[in-house]
UniProtKB/Swiss-Prot annotation:
GO CC terms of this entry: ribonucleoprotein complex; ribosome
NCBIfam families according to UniProt: PRK00010.1
Keyword ATP-binding tagged: no
Family: Belongs to the universal ribosomal protein uL5 family.
InterPro entries assigned to the protein according to its UniProt record, in alphabetical order: Ribosomal_uL5 (IPR002132), Ribosomal_uL5_bac-type (IPR020930), Ribosomal_uL5_C (IPR031309), Ribosomal_uL5_CS (IPR020929), Ribosomal_uL5_dom_sf (IPR022803), Ribosomal_uL5_N (IPR031310)
Name of protein: Large ribosomal subunit protein uL5
Length: 184
C-alpha cells in the first residue's frame, strides 16, 4: 500500500476532523481522483507528436491515456471537428496515490528554481489544478528519448466543500505550496 494512502488514513484524516470539527467521518475531505490532461497543438500537423505524448503519459501514470478530440472545426488552426488534439488520464485508487507521491516527493523538487506550487489554483468546489511545464521532471521519462518538451495539467478532484478544506488536505499530504508572507 502507498505511503501517502497510509498517511491520509492514519494522520491527515484525523487532523482534518479536529481542525474543521466534522461530526461524521464521511464529511472529511478526500481525493476522489486525479485527472492529467495534455493538449498537443502539434498533433494537428503530425500524429507522431500525439503518439509520443501518449507514450510519455503512459510511462508517467502507469495507465494508457484516452485521446481527446476537437469539438468544433477552427479554420485558422487547420482543425476539424473530431480530430485528435490531446490526451487525458483519470487516476483512482492505488495508481492515484502512487502518482501523487511521485509528483510531490520526486518530480516537483526537480523543477528548476522551484519555490512551491501556487496557492491560487483552487476552484469553488475544492478542486486544485496544477500546470506542469515539462514532462522531463518525472523520473519515468528518459531525457534522451524525448523529442520535444511538453507540459500538461494535473487536477486533484476532492470531496472538500471549500478551497480552505482542500488546501488543508493537500498540505497534510505534503503538497509543497508557496510560502505566503507572514507564514513560517
Amino acid at each position: 500500500m502507498a505511503f501517502l494512502k497510509d498517511l491520509y488514513k492514519n494522520k491527515v484524516a484525523k487532523d482534518l476532523q479536529k481542525e474543521f470539527a466534522y461530526s461524521s467521518v464521511m464529511q472529511i475531505p478526500k481525493i476522489e481522483k486525479v485527472v492529467i490532461n495534455a493538449g498537443i497543438g502539434n498533433a494537428v500537423a503530425d500524429k507522431k507528436h500525439l503518439e509520443a505524448a501518449i507514450s510519455e503519459l503512459t510511462l508517467i501514470t502507469g495507465q494508457r491515456p484516452v485521446e481527446t478530440k476537437a469539438k468544433k472545426s477552427i479554420a485558422t488552426f487547420k482543425l476539424r471537428a473530431g480530430q485528435s488534439i490531446g490526451a487525458k488520464v483519470t487516476l483512482r485508487g492505488d495508481r492515484m496515490w502512487a502518482f501523487i507521491e511521485t509528483l510531490f516527493n520526486i518530480a516537483l523538487p526537480r523543477v528548476r528554481d522551484f519555490k512551491g506550487i501556487s496557492n491560487n489554483s483552487f476552484d469553488n468546489q475544492g478542486n486544485y489544478t496544477l500546470g506542469i511545464k515539462e514532462q522531463i521532471i518525472f523520473p519515468q521519462v528518459v531525457y534522451d528519448d524525448v523529442k520535444s518538451v511538453r507540459g500538461f495539467d494535473v487536477t486533484f478532484v476532492t470531496t472538500a466543500k471549500t478551497a480552505q478544506e482542500a488546501k488543508a488536505l493537500l498540505v497534510g499530504l505534503g503538497a509543497p505550496f508557496q510560502k505566503v508572507r507572514g507564514d513560517k
